[in-house]
Structures are given as C-alpha cells and as structure tokens.
From Swiss-Prot:
Descriptive protein name: ER membrane protein complex subunit 8
Top-level taxonomy: Eukaryota, Metazoa, Chordata, Craniata, Vertebrata
Superkingdom of the source species: Eukaryota
Quaternary context: Component of the ER membrane protein complex (EMC). EMC8 and EMC9 are mutually exclusive subunits of the EMC complex.
GO cellular component assignments: cytoplasm; EMC complex
Native organism: Bos taurus
An individual GO BP term: protein insertion into ER membrane by stop-transfer membrane-anchor sequence
Compartments it resides in: Endoplasmic reticulum membrane
Topology versus the membrane: Peripheral membrane protein
Length: 210
C-alpha cells in the first residue's frame, strides 16, 4: 500500500469530532483528490511513487455507529459531493467509546472494507484516546491497511501528517477556542438539514491559522 498522509484540515476535524463527544464513539470518512492514472514504469518507493493524501474529513456519527440505513444515506450523499468536487472516499476513521480501546471493531472493519471496494488504497484510522490532550503533543492516530484480507496496523512511528508541527499547533488552538462546539457531523445534519456537514466555518478557521 502507498504512503498515507493527512492534511492539517483533515486531522483537525477528526480531533474536533472526538473532542465534541468525549464520552461517545465517533466515526467519519476521509476523502482524497481523485488520482491520475499512474505510469507503470515508476519504481515503487522511488521519487515518482504516489501516496494517498487525505485532504478532508467528513464526520459521520456519534454514539451508535452501526445503523446501516443512516450509513447508506450518508455514503450516497457524500459520494455525490465527492464527485462534484473531484474527490473520492478513500478512508474511514473511528474513535471507540472506551478510552483504552484503540483497536478496530467489526463496524470499523466492515465500513472500511466497503470503502476498499471502490478505492484499493483505503486506510482505516483508529484514534488513540490515551494520547488525546488539549495540547495535542503527539499524533493520536493508528493507521491500518488492508493486506491479505485483514486490517493490519502500519508503522506507529511513521509521521502520517503532511505537516505535523502545523497540525499540532492548529488543533491545539482550535481546542483552546472550543471550535468543536460548532463542528457538524452527519447525525447533526439528520437532526436539522440546515447543519452543513462540510463544516465550512471550521475549514475557514484552519485556513486562517495556517
């Protein structure tokens, strides 16, 4: 599987989703720009080798994560939005309810495998709640790849952020200003369709702090 990187915007929104619902399990989707066809002669791992860059994060649900009808509605709407913006659903993230549980459960593996049917380099990202602090001192994620029909954890020491010092600084600033209170997930959108799950205000805040 190619390398995986998250933009500051994608990482921060994932962190804010967990911060808004600290006592619940939360999940969401990660989107990447549509890839151009690769040239076959490029060497693996060489300078021309590609990686998946998650440019944005779409928060899905909090609390109960396994309701299939709601997930289908979300996937359909988000897939349509991705096509309009030349994106593709390329990953799934989840934070479990229990603080010390950072392993993917059946729901996480099932949704990620569903995404992998349409995007071969899908990543499953688990948020490690034990590393979650208001100062965001270290990255809080574990990245899993689909290998031989199983989800396996990638190197935990690898830097999966496109610019970690920036992501650390901005996520800490957003937490300090309680920006998570304005974050909208798909559950919030289903409660009131005026709630925008693309979170334009948070996107602007991240851009302003960059």
């Amino acid at each position: 599987m190619p390398g995986v990187k998250l933009t500051t915007q994608a990482y921060c929104k994932m962190v804010l989703h967990g911060a808004k619902y600290p006592h619940c399990a939360v999940d969401g989707l990660l989107v990447a720009e549509k890839q151009k066809p690769r040239k076959e002669h490029l060497p693996l791992g060489g300078p021309g080798a590609h990686h998946t860059l998650f440019v944005d994060c779409i928060p899905l649900f909090h609390g109960t994560l396994a309701l299939a009808p709601m997930l289908e509605v979300a996937l359909t709407l988000i897939d349509s939005w991705c096509k309009d913006n030349s994106y593709v659903i390329a990953g799934y993230y989840q934070a479990n309810e229990r603080v010390k549980d950072a392993s993917p459960n059946q729901v996480a593996e099932k949704v990620a495998s569903r995404i992998a049917e349409g995007f071969s380099d899908t990543a499953l990202i688990m948020v490690d709640n034990t590393k979650f602090t208001m100062d965001c001192v270290v990255p809080t994620i574990h990245v899993y790849e689909h290998h031989e029909n199983k989800w396996r954890c990638r190197d935990p020491h690898y830097d999966y952020c496109e610019d970690w010092p920036e992501a650390q600084r901005i996520s800490a600033s957003l937490l300090d200003s309680r920006s998570y209170e304005t974050l909208v997930d798909f559950d919030n959108h289903l409660d009131d369709i005026r709630n925008d799950w693309t979170n334009p205000e948070i996107n602007k805040a991240v851009l302003h702090l960059c």
